[in-house]
């Protein structure tokens, strides 16, 4: 396993959207993450007042959550944090590495959304991240994760049109799955409205449900629920929301 892939420069180099936070912000504008997060909090911890979000990106979801909770956001990438501070100056957003960050505050809710956890590839470093989650929790605190729990194994090309501020872009996507490392690689080719082209290679670690359960339990979190966007009784993936309570 190759280790933590979330050093700021490599991540920006391999993901067009991280190199262009404004474009990321537009493309993520229809994200349902904040709404799902609020629903899960209402269900499992309706009296929550404080929240920390690891991997907050441009702060789009945090902006919604901050209407209800006192929030702090952390992200590893200075470009994302700079953009977030300019676009949403009312938010408390900081540069931080979720393997080692310590705010010296315990929060009612700890979140790690948008596949952030999937950029940590090494088992020991995943353990470090869960220790960070626990360091910011007290008895009764919620942990809410959104991460891949099953691989995308189809190898056929997929093409989509993405609206950008300068017009529609065409993106072609191919997935690869390495079972030994549990890494799903997504390769994207962008044809931009300007006529320019860009390439992406995004590598995400799939942490299967029973693995997630074990990582959480080792640091004191008990799993309450795992659900995907279908909200059905059967978990199908490939991405799931995991809710756990600190005991």
Which residue stretches match the model-derived regions?
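A short acidic, Gly/Pro-enriched loop at the edge of an enzyme's catalytic core
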Residues: 102-109
């Amino acid at each position: 396993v190759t280790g933590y892939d979330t050093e700021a420069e490599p991540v920006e180099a391999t993901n067009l959207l991280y190199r262009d936070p404004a474009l990321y912000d537009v493309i993520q504008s229809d994200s349902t993450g904040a709404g799902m997060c609020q629903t899960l909090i209402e269900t499992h911890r309706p009296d929550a007042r404080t929240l920390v979000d690891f991997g907050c990106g441009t702060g789009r979801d945090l902006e919604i959550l901050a209407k209800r909770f006192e929030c702090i956001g952390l992200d590893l990438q200075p470009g994302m944090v700079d953009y977030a501070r300019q676009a949403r100056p009312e938010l408390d957003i900081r540069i931080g590495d979720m393997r080692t960050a310590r705010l010296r505050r315990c929060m009612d809710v700890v979140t790690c959304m948008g596949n952030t956890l999937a950029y940590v590839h090494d088992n020991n470093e995943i353990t470090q991240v869960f220790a960070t989650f626990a360091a910011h929790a007290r008895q009764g605190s919620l942990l809410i994760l959104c991460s891949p729990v099953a691989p995308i194994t189809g190898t056929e090309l997929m093409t989509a049109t993405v609206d950008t501020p300068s017009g529609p872009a065409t993106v072609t996507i191919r997935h690869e799955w390495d079972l030994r490392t549990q890494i799903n690689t997504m390769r994207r080719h962008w044809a931009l409205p300007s006529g320019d082209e860009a390439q992406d290679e995004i590598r995400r670690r799939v942490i299967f449900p029973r693995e997630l359960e074990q990582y959480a339990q080792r640091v004191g979190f008990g799993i309450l629920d795992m659900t995907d966007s279908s909200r059905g009784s059967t978990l199908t993936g490939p991405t799931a929301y995991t809710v756990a309570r600190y005991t």
